[in-house]
């Protein structure tokens, strides 16, 4: 089973050397505890061992292990899609949401539409409804800006450099996400997003949580709350105060 760690990491082409080392350490420790035969019982024992760690460390290890477990399930190495959960008592101790390790979102996916939706929310803080309404005419790749129109209001947001290559192939369309030159429905968007986050080992992530991750990353980068509110199209910073 230990050799599957290398195979798992080989599929994560977008990870840095340090990130791969972190994954390798966590997964080797995981296999040391659960042994060669993964079962509900061995996973419960492993979860119990994590209880004394900091919440951030627990979340990191659980995230890495869940991605690895999903990889094993996809490859037919295990007969069920096992999944670790953060202990309820640990969840209650968490006063503020924490930044999740989502580097895997930049890697290739069998759900490219869901991947792009996730990246637009995570990197720009956009709502699914805003994304579905985006027309290619609203995008200027040269100046790295996007015009968001909502009701009678408009705002201009900066497109991160990393997203330019993701958007460029779609510039010949009418809408960013379309079928027959018409935008997809919200239900379609949520299905695509759901399939993508499940593929990456984060089945509980929603558009709301990804938008929250955008906010947390902005705050970590010392961006002013008023500037964050402007990027999100919020009229006040009241809903952002809890993230201080």
Curated annotation (Swiss-Prot):
One of its GO terms (biological process) is DNA transposition. Residues 1-73 form the Core-binding (CB) domain. One of its GO terms (molecular function) is tyrosine-based site-specific recombinase activity. Its main location: cytoplasm. GO terms for cellular component: cytoplasm; Holliday junction resolvase complex. The active site is at residues 150, 211, 243. It is found in: Cytoplasm. Keywords: Cytoplasm, DNA integration, DNA recombination, DNA-binding. This is Tyrosine recombinase XerD-like. The gene is xerD.
């Amino acid at each position: 089973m230990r050799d599957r760690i290398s195979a798992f990491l080989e599929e994560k082409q977008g990870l840095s050397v340090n990130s791969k080392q972190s994954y390798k350490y966590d997964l080797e420790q995981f296999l040391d505890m659960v042994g060669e035969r993964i079962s509900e019982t061995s996973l419960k024992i492993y979860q119990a061992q994590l209880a004394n760690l900091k919440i951030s460390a627990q979340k990191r290890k659980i995230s890495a292990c869940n991605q690895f477990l999903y990889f094993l399930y996809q490859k037919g190495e295990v007969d069920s899609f096992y999944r670790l959960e953060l202990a309820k008592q640990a969840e209650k101790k968490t006063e503020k949401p924490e930044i999740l390790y989502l580097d895997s979102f930049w890697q290739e996916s069998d759900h490219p539409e869901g991947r792009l939706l996730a990246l637009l929310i995570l990197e720009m803080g956009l709502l699914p409804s805003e994304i579905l309404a985006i027309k290619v005419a609203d995008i200027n790749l040269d100046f790295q800006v996007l015009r968001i129109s909502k009701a009678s209001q408009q705002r201009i947001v900066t497109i991160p450099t990393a997203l330019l290559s993701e958007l460029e192939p779609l510039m010949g369309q009418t809408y960013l996400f379309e079928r027959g030159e018409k935008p997809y429905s919200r239900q379609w968007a949520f299905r695509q997003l759901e399939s993508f986050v499940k593929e990456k080992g984060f089945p509980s992530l929603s558009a709301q949580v990804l938008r929250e991750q955008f906010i947390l990353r902005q705050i970590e980068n010392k961006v002013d709350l008023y500037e964050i509110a402007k990027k999100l199209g919020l009229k006040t910073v009241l809903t952002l105060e809890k993230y201080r």
